[in-house]
């Protein structure tokens, strides 16, 4: 039987360079990915390099709160 909360949680990854450029209004939008992570293996905030269609390059996408 499972104990406590679910181990796998759904998270949102957001492009960090689009968030910075959003202040200057240079970007057309903010790239976001939805994925899952294992809370026991990765207790800290997750950061992955993903493709951002608004920046047209691979950038760091960081985990955000819902």
UniProtKB/Swiss-Prot annotation:
Keywords: Chloroplast, Plastid, Ribonucleoprotein, Ribosomal protein. One of its GO terms (molecular function) is structural constituent of ribosome. One of its GO terms (cellular component) is chloroplast. Gene3D superfamilies: Ribosomal protein L33 (2.20.28.120). Pfam families: Ribosomal_L33. The keyword Chloroplast applies. It is found in: Plastid, Chloroplast. The keyword Lyase does not apply. PROSITE patterns: RIBOSOMAL_L33. GO terms for biological process: translation. PANTHER family: 50S RIBOSOMAL PROTEIN L33, CHLOROPLASTIC, LARGE RIBOSOMAL SUBUNIT PROTEIN BL33C. Belongs to the bacterial ribosomal protein bL33 family. NCBIfam families: PRK00504.1, PRK00595.1, rpmG_bact. This is Large ribosomal subunit protein bL33c. It comes from Barbarea verna (Land cress). The lineage of its organism: Eukaryota, Viridiplantae, Streptophyta, Embryophyta, Tracheophyta. The gene is rpl33.
């Amino acid at each position: 039987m499972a104990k406590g909360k679910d181990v796998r949680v759904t998270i949102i990854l957001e492009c960090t360079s689009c968030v910075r450029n959003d202040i200057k209004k240079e970007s057309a939008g903010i790239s976001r990915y939805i994925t899952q992570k294992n809370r026991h293996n990765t207790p800290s905030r997750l950061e992955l390099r993903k493709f951002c269609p608004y920046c047209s390059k691979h950038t760091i996408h960081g985990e955000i709160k819902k």
